[in-house]
Amino acid sequence: MSGDDAAVFKPNARVLAYHGPLIYEAKVIKIHEKNKTFIEDGEGKHQPIEGGNLPEEYYSVNAYFVHYKGWKAKWDEWVGPDRILEYNEANVQAQKELKEQLTKAKIKPKVKAEPAVASTGTKKRGMPVSSASTVTKKKKTDPNRVNEVSIFMKPELKYILVDDWEFITKERKIINIPSSRPVTVILNDYLQSKKDQDTSHQTMDVINEIMQGLELYFNKSLSLILLYKFERLQYMNLLKEHGDDLRPSELYGVEHLLRLFVALPGLIAQTTMDSVSINVLVKQSKDILEFITDNMSVYLNDYVNVSPAYDSLARS
């Protein structure tokens, strides 16, 4: 996305926007151009940013107030440049591919234990029985498409993402943060598992570098594309508490990490990485997803009910 002072999209533009790990069609209602002191609506009228509910994090960037097609107005929200995409054939195809990763999980029956509901209002998923390892079939690629990658995710993990979406958007729960097993712990556990397999020092250096890159991706993208609207108030509260010391990888856990892997192919497509580096990243991504599948019961987090005040503010 462009960093120019002029806004990339204008009011009333048809766009695509990330909401959580998926992409939805949306319409731009209002815009805020980088470093400007006003917000512009579809009629060209200006409103001071102080009265436009523009989050302070968007004061210094191009930002867009969008309405998701077919959604109620309560879901309208401000999004930054990293969450908005031009409505074109390539991006619509990316939207479909992301959606298919979740809808395929719904086609197959879930084998799940009854979710346990604690007296405190917490809710935790039961895990499906692990399936045998599946060989990923390579898709035919179009040579004209740049950095097209596919990261295989087992049905067990897709079930987690489907439940995750339902708990947050349907039941209006949030994940209990901080996680007892945050992303940084998961990545370190994976590194230790590779060391225990007597992996060579040279290979370990490569794996360690990739894990550092994944953690950096996670920290940079969490607030931009990995949160549902209902979770943003929780994030803002954490930001107030931790300030510049906030590192999402030390607070958020496996559910948000899985959302990153769903979005990762799209992120890779926007980089200038060479094909060798991409192949190494994809291979390690598949390996760590396999590791997460085998250890999911250790990493799952509780969902908790929110207060009426939180519910009201988060939906406003």
Swiss-Prot record:
Q: Where in the cell is it found?
A: Nucleus
Q: In the UniProt record, what gene is named as encoding this protein?
A: EAF3
| Pfam families in the record | MRG, MSL3_chromo-like
Give the start-end ranges of region Disordered: 114-140
Q: Which residues form the MRG domain?
A: 145-316
Give the residue range of the signal peptide.
none
Q: State what this protein does.
A: Involved in deacetylation of histones, chromatin assembly and chromosome segregation. May act as a transcriptional oscillator, directing histone deacetylases to specific chromosomal domains. Component of the NuA4 histone acetyltransferase complex which is involved in transcriptional activation of selected genes principally by acetylation of nucleosomal histone H4 and H2A. The NuA4 complex is also involved in DNA repair.
Q: What is its main location?
A: nucleus
* UniProt record similarity statement: Belongs to the MRG family.
**Protein known as:** Chromatin modification-related protein EAF3
One of the record's GO cellular component terms: nucleosome disassembly/reassembly complex
Q: How does it assemble?
A: Component of the NuA4 histone acetyltransferase complex.
- Name the source's superkingdom: Eukaryota
Kindly list the organism's lineage: Eukaryota, Fungi, Dikarya, Ascomycota, Saccharomycotina
Protein's UniProt keywords contain Ribosomal protein: no
